[in-house]
Curated annotation (Swiss-Prot):
The gene is HEC1. PROSITE patterns: BHLH. It comes from Arabidopsis thaliana. Residues 128-177 form the bHLH domain. It is found in: Nucleus. Pfam families: HLH. This is Transcription factor HEC1.
Length: 241
């Protein structure tokens, strides 16, 4: 196959003696000035480098080099962009699902904050200014630090995070708790309006109250976490407020 192609090419070249004959006067030095683009290596290299530049098309000086944006390259770049976007979306979805699972476990855990753990560290060999403005600023910083230390123990994993990450996680945790309280309120309204509910629980903005009524209603379905878990979740929401 290769030999046939080579023979055919040689046959075609033989039909062009003016261009292919090495003894032809076309290749003489006298014609170098006539065809500078063919024989001037410097010009050829510069011209070749210009055509290889991105954003250049030979003959127009505009647009792009056609060889640099082949259909396969364009298609592969679009495919890679879509795949990267889908991977980012999947990572975001997995992160949100993992965060929600951690939050659901955290709302079931009792909260116990040791007062000694949130006390400000004792300063040693530090001269404390008696200036009123300095004293007020120091007290303000101490209150902020104390609240941050308390918040670290309320947010799941907050003690292992830096302050910025912990505050960001606290925002997600508060949104999760508000969503859970809202869903429980909606369930309380739905189950409470169905022919009387004995011992049903009403969850309001200020906490939980028990209401008794006639009939044989079943009360509130606590979304699989039980009454204790619901009390704990509402308590966590109130503390974070």
């Amino acid at each position: 196959m290769d030999s046939d192609i080579m023979n055919m090419m040689m046959h075609q070249m033989e039909k062009l003696p003016e261009f292919c004959n090495p003894n032809s006067s076309f290749f003489s030095p006298d014609h170098n000035n006539t065809y500078p683009f063919l024989f001037n290596s410097t010009h050829y290299q510069s011209d070749h480098s210009m055509t290889n530049e991105p954003g250049f098309r030979y003959g127009s000086g505009l647009l792009t080099n056609p060889s640099s944006i082949s259909p396969n390259t364009a298609y592969s770049s679009v495919f890679l962009d879509k795949r990267n976007n889908s991977n980012n979306n999947n990572n975001g979805t997995n992160m949100a699902a993992m965060r929600e699972m951690i939050f659901r476990i955290a709302v079931m855990q009792p909260i116990h904050i040791d007062p000694e753990a949130v006390k400000p560290p004792k300063r040693r060999n530090v001269r404390i200014s008696k200036d009123p403005q300095s004293v007020a600023a120091r007290h303000r910083r101490e209150r902020i630090s104390e609240r941050i230390r308390i918040l670290q123990r309320l947010v799941p994993g907050g003690t292992k995070m830096d302050t910025a990450s912990m505050l960001d996680e606290a925002i997600h945790y508060v949104k999760f708790l508000k969503k859970q309280v809202q869903s429980l309120e909606e369930q309380a309204v739905v189950t409470g309006g169905g022919g009387g509910g004995g011992g049903r629980v009403l969850i309001g903005g200020g906490g939980m109250t028990a209401a008794s009524g006639g009939g044989g209603g079943g009360g509130v379905v606590m979304k699989g976490c039980g009454t204790v878990g619901t009390h704990q979740m509402v308590g966590n929401a109130q503390i974070l407020r």
